[in-house]
């Protein structure tokens, strides 16, 4: 209700304090209020406060801590709530003592008409922080802006104005009871009750409104003026609530605190030193709270150390002060700290967390943990008083490494100690599953006793070198090895034999024995009562230690207690070790803020004053002034001159160097490794599409678009833009015109800054608006700033916090089906955790670097491993160096300035070193001995190299200074020294900050332009690569290097500031990644020769040719940690410092500038690449028909020539060498560790600060593991921390499955290896694959029944283009069906069939139904397409036209009479406006009269004459109805024939097609109806056109009588020709070529005397087409699927409109029997696509009346039944049931015909499939028809199907039947069945029984068909 213990009492009246204490006692249910006397008398507030000295708030502590600490070190329980915002509501409820549900709170209803929307007040005004963060809000004096949380809007904070008297105030006074607040939305004031206020702002609470529950945060403005979430408001409930989250341990838990005295006597509001972090127990494995109290050790958390400045206005905010416990209170409130000075009275103490459940069987008393925390009273032996001025007196801030057991309470000067949880998890051995134990080689996890662990710890500390610090990962492996040895020993013992344990009594002397070999660097202190004794003794000795006495580095304090067992901890006293451990506990952001604070508050003033004098004791500024005066106005000559040559500034500015065109500077080449990786990416995308998960449909897309998101670095943005422009990818993808691509490129590269949201929304709009474009979102350097949006509120002004998460993981991105996410990283470890969103199978790793050498690359990658290996090369000047002299200087300075961060000290020293080196090399040789040889060597090379030639080219030095403030200081200082020495025209100093563009002086820009031959006046360098050849120092700042590529002239990389603060793998390796590059092969193959090459080369170059523009690099420079040469004389050359050499002029045309090559990301390496290799960029995809898919080479002709020129030069003349890296000692010991082999390497460190190890027991990560293996290792053993963007991606609690984003890939490769070029190439080949390399499955089946065919004696000679009508008409018709789709159909009887042995036929024919064979083919430019194809050329076929265009079509009825149907038929045409020219309309009323037809004599090369009809059903999406490409874009008349009910769908998908809509009566009809109506309509139209044209004087026979009827699955057409036979006796091959439908039709339409042919067609393609099958160029046989039909000749031959199957075979047989010609062109073939939906599909046959939901399969024999029976009636067309029944009933209907092909079934006027075991003899009843010769044939059956009047009794009497032959008569109804029997006199020869009458199983409403069977007598 208003009490607060978040402050201390300053000078309050007794009554007020008493009142508040009484109220707190009454209201407190979970913890003890602060005693009244401690409020009054223990107030330590002695320090005046200055608001000007407030330090900006450091980032919140690591989220894995159980208690976050406040700025003074006391436990601030409220922070756990802040970090688990999503759990607020749960936490509230967990305070309840019972498990009963909370009583719901009933709110007063809102006033009528008021707004009730969450996030808005009742007046309808927005209160959400996201909406108001930029608003200027006026609040009355005395009010503060605070944030309220609504349970309905967990992600939002509501802004309120509250009177600060009712909040816990800044001065520690208790908040007044009650409430006073204003609504900042509508401005309403004077809310006196929080209940009333909560109603007004629509909090909609389910519990009683309390300000303590719902007012959560102070709101503060950032430096940018943005209102954002500030610190928590510390209500008492927030603190006590923590109890529920602490129930991991079964013992009471106390806290650690460090009350801190102001440093240096200042009172600036900053808590000096470091906070003591919390220790023994992490939170649960995922960083959250545990819901049940478990004694199982939790997964290790991760800890960080944070100096905690305050947001509030006093030093002591949030500090608890309590006196001794009183009996009436239930317990001592945990976390009570002490005053800042040690108190004489028994002071309240700070205590670390007690140890968790013992892991080993040591006798430890157990205390049950209840719902409230009840730590026991402090015992005298369990407290440690930290001595005053410990840090000041000793120069050491001790670090206490928590070991095993209960740490004591600390009080007094606790700011001078640090408690570190570094090794604590090593001692908490987790329970592992059996499979994990087996993997680790362990029998159990209970192998090590506490005594073993103590001895292992001591041995480890003894083994550490003087410059090393303990590493958790290293010690974990030691513990694991020990456990494995114990396991081996345990297995070796006989069964049941005990392993003798170490007794507690043996421990002290064994421990001392182990430490005795450490040369007094490790001490052991053994006590009997508690650890407090040992720690107190250690601190006392430290405070009394004299400066000349040697301190041990480590003191191991052991408590050998008989009651509690052995406990221990380690006190680190080593000057280097303690500082390094303390600093390594800070995250990068935290230590940068710490440095910033030290600079802002003037804490560095002592250090700065120290460096105001030179090493010789002179005043530096005065000395520089004196040198400037001595030099006067002149400056050192810019180039081509010595350092002592001076010119005027005007002359220096006007000096123009010789032009040195770098030919391939602007060209972009893709090298073989990049192409290989791009293809891997492409194949992975294909794998996603093929996975069956339906997450990606590549056939849907015809275009590729992209966006590249990069971290917040201006240089990186410009660098990526350059790559995009140079690669030409925008033009290649068709995204931009070539003229505009350069300026439009900026749309495609976006940086993660505050403006990204709007840009990204534009991109996502494009994604939604273009469903047929596949978008690729490339997230480059994706490991940077991968923090979650939810934790963004804790970042306090971090500009990029959560932005990547907001973009990459937003719902729209995850759900967009046309968006691929490609995350690219050199250090992907933070993306490879247990919570990763990327499937491990979707990772694409760079190719093994040794394979690059095998591929014959001229340049090889030189990365981190190569740098480490180079230490073993034995060369005099290693590439990886540690400046020992510098490290000694640093060490001395750090002892003098123990309170400053070591990076500050290092940076000041580095500035001095470079300044003095400049002075020593120019004017003060006496300073030479005071610069380290390393620094002197670098500066000498830098300033002398431009003077050696007329080009003025030189080297680049990169100095890495992570702190922006320090970097600016370094730049200003070095620039000042340079200018005063007159070197401002000699070399440039550039600040490389991520936030700003490069700034280069005008005269240097002019020089760069000259070298480039760049005549663009406005050009300025925008990337580091643009600085190629410029002598310069780049001071690279920013938290992380962000993947910027440096030029080939980079020669030195100074990383001496990168030290113990960089103890994660990513942090350390990405720093060295700056220098990685491509080098000449010789450097890796023969390093000693290669690296000493340049010195020998120098001897050969004549002095007269010193004006060459080429530079050679010499690495023979002294370095301080191996064979350093410290010069003593003033001569530079004597000192061996400078030996840069030059190359002769004649070679310069052939040579590219030497030095290393930066292939990353894809630009202009001078690698020998023969241009032809990569011209075909899809050469891995070489389809048989893709000859047309060649692409232009990516590199320009100039670069190809240049690359070839390089390959012709003599090898070894110039060698591209890697830069030299100078490291700090800490980094060198980790990165150079391969040399010794014993030390840990960087790869064993925690992979990234945002992840945590899952278990302390895990196998080691080996250096030789492949990238893929490392990924699997990290995915198993690391988890995301709470602030990580992937933290929310937790496994499903039930299934354990993780949510993976199926369309997300990860490309990983070493830094600067060429990943950008690779993914740009990937975009290009992805596009090509979508457009040109689409594959299609076509049927690939050989013809059937080829052995039944009549061998025609008559045949035309090969090579004839058209059939000769005379010859062709004499050829017999081959009645056998050869189309493989009719494999299971009845054979058509011929004389040839009668002669074939039945056994062969039987054996051949009996086969199981099987899947039809298909083959994958490449679509060519002449393919027919479905709706999923879209391109610029065929826009008129685009699907989903807006509704406005649907009305562009008109509906026309067309009526004609049909003799077959016996009635008028009305069809509907839907004709788009654009197609109306094909039709004739009446002048009045626009009535459709006819469809225009051409003349036979027309000759138009850009048209085909025949209208194309395509019947289609069920394939509105998948039917191949887009004939634009197949017709080569020419005008043609194409009509879709669709059923009435499907018309809306087809109209939607094909709005620009002419539709012919069948009458509704044919909705359930088969394909026969469509073909029948097409033919009927066409004939009627032909007559209309003849009449119309006859009036115009055209003869009737001159009108074109043909139509094309084509299936909707015809995809490709081919032409075949027989190749010439060689002399060899092998069969001649055939050549095939893909052709267009247009050319096929035009060829067939040009057939001489074409009007005499009834049907023309082509054969079906199969892969085994041989010259034998093409022997006859034309066949007289069946044609299917694609026919030219002469509707005039076939006027009297009709399709059977009832048919569902075999309608074309039936029609062909009718046509042939009428004496008409059917011609098949064998030199053309048709490919049919395997379309899996729609078309000639079976009906699902089910009962008409469904009795139950379960559908029982209905067998074909149930499709018929006896008339009037109780049979289940079916819902299917009668004709369909009949045809399906006949296919399966041949055994019952025609038993004599089974496999009896000599005696076929006689079918009059019809062909029906009656099963593959039966042959059918087709006979026409028409007079003068040509039929097969039936003489001597005895038929086994007779089939009469709907026979007409031409069938008479006389006809039937001509045929002979076997005895027992069967008859089947089929009619429309029962009466016509009886009439037919009588009319045909069938009863004379056939016997009928009443039970032999059947009907199809339809109801009478559905008009069943009837049939009667009988037997021949």
Curated annotation (Swiss-Prot):
Disruption phenotype: Embryonic lethal at the homozygous state. At 13.5 dpc, all homozygous embryos are significantly smaller compared to wild-type and heterozygous littermates and present with exencephaly. Male and female embryos lack kidney and show absence of Wolffian and Muellerian ducts, respectively. However, mesonephric tubules are consistently observed. Some potential remnants of ureteric bud are present in most mutant embryos. In male mutant embryos, the gonads are severely affected, being small and with poorly organized sex-cords compared to wild-type littermates. It is found in: Membrane. Residues 86-111, 281-309, 1097-1157, 1179-1207 are annotated as: Disordered. Pfam families: cpSF2-GREB1, GREB1_2nd, GREB1_C, GREB1_N, TAGT. One of its GO terms (cellular component) is membrane. It is a single-pass membrane protein. Residues 1118-1157 have a biased composition (Polar residues). Plays a major role in early metanephros and genital development. This is GREB1-like protein. It comes from Mus musculus.
């Amino acid at each position: 209700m208003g009490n607060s213990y978040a402050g201390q009492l300053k000078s309050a009246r007794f009554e007020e304090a008493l009142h508040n204490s009484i109220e707190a006692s009454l209201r407190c249910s979970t913890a003890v209020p602060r005693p009244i006397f401690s409020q009054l008398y223990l107030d330590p507030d002695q320090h005046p406060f200055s608001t000007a000295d407030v330090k900006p708030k450091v980032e919140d502590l690591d989220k894995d801590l159980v208690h976050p600490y406040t700025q003074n070190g006391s436990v601030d329980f409220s922070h756990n709530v802040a970090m688990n915002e999503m759990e607020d509501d749960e936490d509230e409820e967990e305070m309840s003592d019972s498990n009963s549900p909370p009583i719901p709170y009933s709110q007063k209803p809102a006033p009528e008409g008021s707004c009730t929307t969450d996030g808005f007040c009742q007046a309808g005004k927005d209160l959400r922080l996201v909406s108001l963060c930029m608003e200027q809000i006026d609040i009355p004096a005395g009010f503060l802006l605070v944030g309220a949380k609504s349970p309905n809007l967990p992600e939002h904070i509501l802004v309120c104005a509250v009177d600060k008297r009712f909040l816990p105030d800044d001065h520690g006074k208790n908040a007044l009871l009650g409430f006073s607040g204003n609504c900042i939305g509508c401005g309403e004031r004077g809310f006196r009750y929080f209940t009333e206020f909560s109603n007004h702002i629509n909090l909609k609470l389910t519990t009683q409104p309390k300000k303590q529950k719902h007012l959560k945060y102070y709101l503060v403005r950032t430096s940018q003026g943005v209102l954002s979430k500030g610190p928590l408001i510390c209500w008492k409930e927030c603190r006590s609530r923590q109890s529920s989250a602490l129930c991991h341990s079964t013992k009471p838990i106390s806290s650690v605190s460090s009350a801190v005295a102001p440093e240096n006597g200042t009172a600036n509001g900053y808590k000096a030193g470091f906070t003591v972090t919390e220790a023994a127990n992490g939170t649960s494995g995922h960083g959250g709270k545990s819901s049940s109290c478990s004694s199982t050790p939790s997964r290790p958390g991760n800890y960080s150390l944070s100096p905690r400045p305050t947001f509030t206005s006093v030093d002591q905010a949030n500090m608890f002060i309590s006196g001794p416990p009183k009996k009436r209170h239930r317990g001592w409130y945990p976390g009570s700290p002490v005053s800042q000075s040690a108190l004489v009275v028994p002071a309240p103490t700070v205590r670390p967390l007690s140890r968790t459940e013992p892991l080993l069987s040591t006798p430890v008393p157990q205390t049950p943990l209840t719902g409230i925390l009840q730590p026991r009273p402090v015992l005298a032996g369990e407290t440690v008083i930290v001595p005053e001025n410990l840090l000041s007196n000793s120069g050491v801030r001790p670090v206490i490494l928590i070991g095993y057991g209960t740490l004591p309470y600390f009080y007094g000067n606790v700011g001078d100690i640090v408690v570190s949880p570094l090794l604590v998890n090593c001692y908490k051995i987790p329970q592992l599953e059996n499979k994990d134990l087996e993997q680790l080689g362990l029998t159990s996890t209970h192998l090590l006793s506490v005594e073993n662990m103590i001895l292992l710890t001591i041995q480890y500390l003894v083994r550490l070198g003087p410059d090393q610090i303990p590493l958790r990962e290293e010690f974990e492996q030691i513990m694991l090895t020990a456990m494995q040895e114990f396991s081996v020993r345990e297995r070796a013992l006989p069964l049941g034999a005990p392993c003798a344990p170490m007794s507690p009594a043996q421990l002290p002397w064994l421990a001392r024995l182990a430490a005795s070999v450490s040369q007094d660097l490790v001490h052991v202190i053994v006590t009997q009562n508690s650890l407090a004794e040992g720690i107190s003794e250690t601190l006392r000795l430290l405070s009394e230690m004299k400066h000349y006495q040697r301190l041990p580095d480590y003191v191991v304090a052991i408590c050998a207690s008989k009651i509690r067992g052995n406990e221990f901890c380690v006190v680190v006293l080593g000057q280097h070790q303690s500082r390094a451990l303390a600093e390594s506990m800070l995250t990068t952001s935290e230590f940068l803020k710490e440095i910033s604070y030290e600079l802002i508050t003037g804490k560095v003033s002592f250090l700065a004053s120290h460096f105001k004098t030179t090493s010789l004791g002179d005043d530096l500024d005065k000395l520089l002034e004196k040198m400037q005066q001595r030099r006067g106005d002149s400056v050192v000559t810019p180039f081509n001159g010595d350092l002592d040559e001076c010119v005027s500034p005007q002359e220096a500015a006007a000096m123009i160097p010789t032009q040195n065109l770098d030919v391939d500077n602007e060209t972009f080449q893709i090298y073989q490794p990049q192409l290989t990786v791009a293809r891997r990416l492409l194949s992975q995308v294909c794998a996603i599409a093929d996975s069956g998960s339906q997450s990606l449909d590549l056939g849907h897309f015809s275009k590729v678009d992209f966006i590249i998101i990069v971290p917040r670095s201006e240089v990186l943005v410009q660098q990526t833009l350059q790559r995009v422009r140079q690669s030409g990818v925008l033009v290649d993808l068709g995204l931009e015109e070539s003229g505009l691509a350069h300026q439009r490129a900026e749309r495609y590269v976006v940086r993660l800054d505050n403006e990204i949201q709007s840009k990204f929304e534009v991109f996502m709009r494009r994604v939604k608006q273009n469903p047929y474009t596949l978008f690729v979102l490339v997230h480059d350097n994706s490991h940077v700033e991968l923090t979650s949006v939810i934790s963004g509120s804790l970042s306090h002004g971090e500009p990029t916090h959560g932005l990547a998460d907001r973009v990459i993981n937003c719902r729209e991105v995850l759900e967009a089906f046309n968006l691929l996410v490609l995350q690219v990283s050199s250090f992907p470890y933070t993306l490879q955790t247990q919570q990763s969103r990327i499937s491990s199978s979707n990772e694409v790793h760079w190719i093994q670097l040794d394979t690059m050498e095998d591929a014959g690359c001229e340049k090889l990658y030189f990365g981190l491993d190569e740098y480490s290996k180079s230490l073993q090369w034995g060369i005099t000047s290693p590439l990886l160096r540690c400046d020992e002299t510098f490290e000694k200087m640093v060490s001395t300075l750090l002892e003098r300035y123990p309170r400053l961060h070591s990076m500050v000290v290092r940076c000041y020293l580095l500035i001095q070193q470079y300044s003095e080196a400049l002075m020593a090399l120019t004017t003060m040789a006496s300073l030479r001995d005071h610069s380290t040889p390393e620094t002197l060597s670098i500066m000498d090379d830098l300033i002398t190299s431009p003077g050696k030639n007329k080009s003025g080219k030189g080297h680049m030095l990169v100095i890495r200074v992570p702190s922006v403030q320090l970097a600016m200081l370094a730049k200003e200082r070095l620039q000042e020294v340079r200018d005063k020495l007159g070197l401002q025209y000699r070399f440039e100093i550039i600040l490389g900050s991520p936030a700003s563009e490069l700034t280069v002086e005008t005269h240097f820009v002019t020089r760069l332009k000259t070298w480039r031959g760049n005549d663009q006046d406005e050009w300025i360098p925008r990337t580091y690569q643009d600085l190629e050849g410029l002598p310069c120092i780049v001071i690279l700042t920013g938290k992380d290097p962000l993947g910027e590529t440096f030029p080939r002239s980079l020669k030195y990389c100074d990383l001496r500031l990168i030290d113990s603060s960089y103890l994660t793998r990513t942090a350390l390796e990405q720093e060295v990644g700056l220098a990685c590059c491509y080098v000449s092969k010789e450097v890796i193959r023969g390093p000693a020769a290669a690296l000493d090459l340049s010195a020998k080369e120098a001897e050969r170059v004549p002095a007269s040719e010193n004006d060459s523009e080429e530079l050679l690099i010499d690495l023979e420079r002294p370095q301080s940690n191996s064979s350093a040469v410290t010069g003593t004389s003033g001569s530079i050359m004597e000192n061996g410092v400078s030996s840069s050499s030059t190359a002769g002029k004649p070679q310069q045309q052939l040579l590219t500038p030497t030095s290393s090559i930066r292939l990353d990301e894809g630009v202009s390496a001078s690698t020998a690449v023969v241009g032809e290799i990569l011209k075909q960029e899809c050469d891995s995809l070489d389809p048989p028909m893709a000859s047309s898919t060649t692409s232009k080479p990516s590199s320009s002709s100039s670069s190809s020539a240049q690359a070839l020129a390089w390959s012709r030069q003599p090898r070894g003349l110039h060698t591209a060498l890697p830069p030299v890296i100078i490291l700090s000692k800490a980094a060198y010991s980790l990165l150079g560790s391969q040399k010794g082999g014993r030390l840990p390497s960087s790869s064993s460190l925690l992979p990234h600060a945002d992840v945590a190890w899952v278990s302390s027991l895990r196998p080691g990560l080996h250096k030789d593991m492949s990238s893929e293996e490392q990924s699997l290792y990290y995915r198993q053993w690391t988890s995301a921390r709470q602030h990580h963007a992937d933290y929310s991606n937790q496994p499903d609690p039930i299934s354990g499955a993780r949510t993976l984003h199926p369309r997300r890939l990860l490309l990983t490769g070493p830094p600067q290896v060429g990943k950008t070029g690779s993914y740009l190439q990937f975009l290009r080949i992805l596009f090509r694959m979508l457009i040109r390399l689409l594959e299609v499955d076509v049927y690939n089946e050989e013809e059937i029944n080829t052995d039944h065919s009549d061998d025609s004696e008559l045949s035309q000679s090969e090579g004839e283009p058209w059939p000769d009508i005379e010859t062709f008409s004499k050829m017999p018709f081959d009645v056998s069906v050869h189309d493989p789709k009719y494999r299971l159909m009845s054979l058509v009887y011929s004389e040839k069939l009668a002669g074939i042995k039945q056994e062969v036929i039987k054996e051949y024919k009996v086969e199981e139904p099987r899947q039809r064979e298909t083959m994958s083919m490449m679509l060519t430019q002449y393919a027919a397409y479905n709706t999923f194809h879209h391109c610029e050329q065929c826009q008129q076929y685009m699907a989903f036209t807006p509704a406005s265009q649907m009305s562009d079509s008109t509906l026309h009825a067309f009526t004609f009479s049909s003799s077959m149907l016996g009635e008028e038929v009305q069809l509907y045409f839907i004709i788009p406006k654009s197609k109306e020219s094909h039709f004739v309309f009446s002048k009045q009323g626009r009535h459709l009269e006819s469809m225009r037809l051409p003349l036979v004599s027309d000759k138009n090369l850009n048209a085909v004459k025949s209208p194309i009809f395509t019947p289609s059903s069920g394939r509105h999406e998948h039917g191949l109805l887009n004939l634009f490409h197949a017709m080569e874009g020419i005008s043609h008349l194409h009509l879709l024939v669709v059923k009435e009910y499907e018309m809306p769908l087809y109209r939607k998908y094909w709005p620009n097609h002419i539709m012919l809509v069948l009458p509704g009566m044919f909705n359930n009809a088969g394909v026969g109806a469509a073909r029948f109506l097409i033919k009927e309509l066409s004939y009627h139209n032909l007559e209309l056109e003849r009449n119309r044209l006859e009036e115009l004087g055209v003869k009737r026979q001159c009108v074109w009588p043909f139509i094309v009827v084509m299936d909707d699955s015809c995809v490709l057409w081919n032409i075949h020709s027989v190749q010439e036979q060689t002399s060899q006796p092998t069969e001649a091959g055939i050549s095939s070529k893909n052709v267009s439908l247009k050319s096929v039709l035009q060829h067939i339409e040009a057939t001489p005397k074409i009007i005499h042919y009834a049907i023309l067609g082509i054969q079906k393609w199969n892969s085994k087409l041989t010259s034998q099958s093409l022997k006859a160029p034309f066949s007289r046989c069946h044609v299917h699927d694609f026919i030219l039909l002469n509707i005039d000749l076939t006027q009297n031959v009709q399709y059977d409109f009832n048919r569902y199957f075999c309608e074309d075979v039936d029609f062909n047989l009718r046509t042939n029997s009428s004496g008409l010609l059917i011609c098949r062109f064998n030199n053309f073939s048709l490919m049919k696509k395997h379309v899996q939906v729609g078309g000639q599909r079976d009906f699902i046959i089910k009962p008409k009346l469904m009795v139950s939901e379960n559908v029982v399969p209905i067998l074909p024999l149930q499709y018929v039944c006896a008339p009037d029976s109780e049979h289940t009636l079916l819902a299917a067309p009668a004709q369909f049931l009949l045809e399906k029944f006949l296919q399966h009933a041949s055994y019952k209907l025609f038993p004599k015909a089974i496999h009896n092909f000599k005696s076929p079934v006689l079918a009059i006027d019809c062909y029906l499939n009656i099963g593959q075991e039966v042959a059918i003899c087709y006979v026409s009843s028409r007079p003068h028809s040509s039929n097969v010769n039936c003489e001597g044939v005895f038929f086994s059956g007779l089939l009469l199907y709907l026979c007409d009047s031409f069938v008479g009794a006389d006809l039937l009497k001509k045929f002979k039947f076997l005895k027992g032959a069967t008859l089947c008569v089929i009619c429309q109804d029962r009466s016509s069945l009886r009439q037919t029997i009588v009319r045909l006199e069938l009863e004379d020869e056939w016997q009928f029984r009443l039970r032999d009458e059947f009907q199809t199983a339809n109801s009478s409403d559905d008009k069943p068909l009837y049939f009667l069977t009988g037997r021949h007598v």
